[in-house]
Amino acid sequence: MSDNQELHVDNPSAADINVREDRRDFIKRSMVVMAAGAVAAAGATGQASASPAVAPVSRLKRKEAIGNTFDYLILGGGSAGAVLAARLSEDGKKSVLLVEAGPSFDPEQYPEELYSSNIIAANADPRYEWGYYALPDKQEQPVYTPRGKVIGGSSAINGAVACRALPYDFERITAKGLKGWSYEEVLPYFRKMETYHTGRDEIHGRNGPFPIHQLTMDYITPVQKAMVESSWKLGYAKVSDFNDPTANNGAGPNPMNIVNGVRVNTGMAYLSREVRERSNLTILSDALIDKLRFQGNRVQAALLADGREVFGKQVILSAGSYGTTAILLRSGVGPKADLAAMNIPLVKDAPVGTQLLDHAFYWMNFAARPELKGKEHPVVGAQVWTHSSFASSARELDIAVSPSHLLDPAISKTGVAFSLGLELMKVKSTGTVKLKSRDPKEAPVIQFNHLSDKDDMRRMVECFRLARKLARTEPLKSLIVEEIYPGPSVGDSDAQISEALAKGVGTLQHPCATARMGLASDPLAVVDGEGRVHGLQGLRIVDASIFPEIPLINLNPNVIMMAEKIADRIRGEEA
C-alpha cells in the first residue's frame, strides 16, 4: 500500500470521494474537540499544542529510511512505538526511524474500521489486523486473538477502555526489586499522557496528548446502566472514576479514550500532523520486520522481510507481545533448545515467549427485550470491578463483569442481544509464544493455557456466578428475555460451570509478559527495569511483553505510561 492510498480504491467514484471526505470531516471535528480541550485545560499554564486538524502534513520520508543510521530505530508503531517516536523526536538533534508492518494514515484520515469506537478488531480486516489464532485447549476451535497492524497498533482496534493499573500492581513490580516502578513514581507519566477533564487534579493530567473521557450514567446504554444499578443493589460501591485508586472497587461507567465516537489511537494522539512534520522523524510503514542482526552481543541493524536493512545506534523493539517475541526468536534470542530445533544460530539464551500471561474472558449472552433495539451504543461502557473471595485482600481486584453490545442480534429471538463479559484479572496460568517456522510472514504459535491453574478456575467460577446474579437482579432482570449462552443446561454447580468455562474461554486481548522485566538474577527476566535486554548491547524492549506481572485491568493506558516513562529515561541518559 503506497503512502497516499487511503482505502485501496484504484479508481474512486464521486461517491467514494464523498464518503472519504465525510470520514475526514468527522475525524477532524472530533480531533478539534480533543485539541480544544487540551488548549482550554492548558490555559492556566500557557502551554498548549497546535491542533493537528490544522497542521500541514508532509509525505513520509521513505527514502531516508534505508541506508542511513538513526540515533533511535523503533520497530513497531503501536501503543508504545508511536509514543516513543513522538517523545524521542522532540530532541531535534536526534534522528528517529519508526518502522511499522501495517499502513500509516494521516491522523485525520483513518478508515472507519479503525476510528469507529463501535467497531472492535477492525472487523477482522487483514489490512489492519494480524489475524492471529491461539491453539485451543479444551475449546472446540482455535481462539481468535486480534492484534492491530497499523500506525497506532492495537490501540486502533481495541475497546478503548482507559483504566490504569492499581497501586497494588506496582507493589508487585517493586517487590521484585525493580526500582522506579512504584505507583508514586509512575503517576507523573499517567498524568503526562492524558487530557482528563474530571476527577482529582492530583491524580489526573489536564493537557496531555491522549484524551480520556469519563462516561456518565446518562451516556451509557440501558443495559449497561441497568447492570451498574443491579451491582449497586447487590452492595457494590458506586464508582465515578475507576482511575482513582482510593475509590475504584465497585461499579460504574468507564473512562474511555473516545471523542465523539472516534477511538483515539496513539497514531492520532501522539503522531499528529505537527509531529510528523519534524525533519528528524522518519516513518517507514508497510515494512514487515524479519529479525535483528548482531555483531557479537551488540545489535547492528534490523532486517526487513524484503531483504532491506535499517540501522540504529539504539534499537527499540515495540512490536507487541507476539511480534516482539517472534522477532527476538528469529534473531537468535530465546530458549536455546527451541532455537536449535529451528536451526537458528544462538545469540542469547533467554526465556523469551515462555511466560505468556493474558486475561481470560468468557461471554455470557442474553436475548434482550425488543424495545431496546437501537439503544446499543456505546458498545462498551461500564463494568463492575471487584475482588473474589479468593483475593489476597480487598485491594486485589481480580474479577470484573462488563456488559457489551457486540453480538450479532440474529442470535436472539427478539432481535436484540447483549453480553456480560466475564473477566479474570488476576492470572496464574501461563502460556507460550513460539515460532512455527523462520518465515516472518507466518504467524507465531500461541498457547494461552487459560484457566489451567486451579486458582484461576476458582476465581472465574465465582465471576460466572456474579454475572448470573446480576442478570437475576433488578433492574437488569427486567431487560432480559432469556440466557442464550451457555443457557439453562449449565446449572450452578462448580463442575458444570467449570466445564462450560473450559470449553468457552477466550481472550480479553491483553497478552503480556513474554519478555519480562526483572533483575539480572531473575531466571524469568529478559530485560531490566529500563527495558534494556540483559546481556545484549544497544537493544531495548518497550511494550506489554516486558510487564513482569499482568496488571489487574486493561493494558493499553499502562503501555502508554510505560513508553512515556522509558522515553523520558532514554532522553535523560542522552542529556
Describe these PLM feature segments:
Residues 1-25, 49:
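N-terminal secretory signal peptides
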Residues 87, 91, 95, 102-107, ...:
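Glycine-rich loop(s) and the adjacent beta-strand/alpha-helix scaffold that form part
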Residues 22-39, 327:
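N-terminal export leaders
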Residues 258, 290-291, 400-402, 475-550:
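A glycine-rich dinucleotide-binding beta-alpha-beta segment and adjacent secondary-structure elements
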Residues 101-146:
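N-terminal FAD cofactor-binding segment of flavoenzymes
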Residues 18, 169, 174-291, 295-299, ...:
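Conserved redox-cofactor binding core of oxidoreductases
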Residues 179, 360-469, 505-513, 521, ...:
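FAD cofactor-binding and catalytic pocket of flavoenzymes
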Residues 14-20, 41-82, 91-95, 103-106:
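C-terminal segment of N-terminal export signals and the immediately downstream linker at the start
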